[in-house]
Regions:
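Glycine-rich flexible loops
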Residues: 2-10, 14-263
Length: 263
């Protein structure tokens, strides 16, 4: 009997040791993934500023944690998009509560939390105040496909008109999520834009393309006689061609290299 107990005790100890090692390995892997994501967020912030998406310390970017879909990393308040660091990135839950990090969170955190809550397919959310897209949001007109960048948001761009003020409550954030629907972005009337994606690369390139599409549209309309949009079948084919994941990565990596060359 004593030998049986001893055998069970040794077996239990071995099981605990295996679980401990397995848990430690998982934690280590998660830590490595988290670090890579934070590094990508830092690069994304620098690219956004280089592409004219900055507005002092306003604007924010978030990314859902792959190992816990109820948490996301987010840029903190009071710094520019190009000042994101490993140390100041916040970890936030889907109710907008900071669960890790000492910096102050953005009051518009609910744009991110409510979209991530409503859209399990979305991992990255960016909100900025780009000049042309914000101007377009103020006209009450949607984005037309006068250029290739505009095709990316064809039938995929909502409009939020409930307020022109900051999105500071869960209810307002939920309103933005409803305006987004199953689309790729939202024009916030007289305010700015929100763009989403499955990856950081897709979302950064998407918000840059939205601004380019809005710029072309406003220039065309300012010329006095708007050209007709592309035929629907052409737009849908073009949208498919420019929506491939590898294209987003290639273009994002190019912009990162350009930022690094410029110092």
């Amino acid at each position: 009997m004593a030998k049986a107990k001893s055998s069970r005790s040794k077996s239990t100890s071995r099981s605990k040791a295996v679980r401990s090692k397995t848990g430690g390995a998982k934690t280590k892997r998660a830590g490595g993934i988290h670090r890579e994501l934070k590094e990508r967020l830092i690069l994304a912030g620098k690219v956004l500023v280089a592409e004219g998406q900055d507005d002092f310390t306003r604007g924010h970017i978030s990314f859902r944690l792959p190992d816990d879909p109820n948490l996301f990393f987010m840029k903190p308040h009071s710094i520019g998009l190009d000042e994101i660091t490993m140390e100041n990135i916040l970890t936030i839950d889907l109710e907008g509560n900071v669960v890790a990090g000492k910096a102050r969170r953005h009051s518009e955190v609910y744009i991110h939390s409510e979209i991530l809550k409503a859209r399990p397919d979305v991992n990255c959310v960016i909100h900025t105040h780009p000049t042309y897209a914000t101007a377009l949001s103020s006209t009450g007109r949607g984005l037309k496909c006068y250029s290739q960048p505009g095709a990316l948001f064809y039938d995929a761009l909502g409009t939020y008109t409930d307020t022109i003020n900051l999105i500071r409550t869960q209810e307002m954030g939920a309103g933005v999520a409803r305006a987004l629907g199953d689309g790729r972005g939202v024009l916030l009337k007289n305010h700015g834009v929100v763009v989403i994606g499955a990856s950081i690369e897709e979302t950064v390139i998407g918000i840059i393309m939205l601004e380019n599409g809005a710029m072309v549209q406003l220039l065309v309309e300012a010329a006095g006689e708007a050209a007709p949009e592309f035929p629907r079948e052409d737009i849908e084919k073009l949208k498919h061609d420019i929506s491939r994941a590898e294209q987003f990565v290639v273009n994002f990596d190019y912009l990162v290299r350009r930022v690094k060359r410029r110092g």
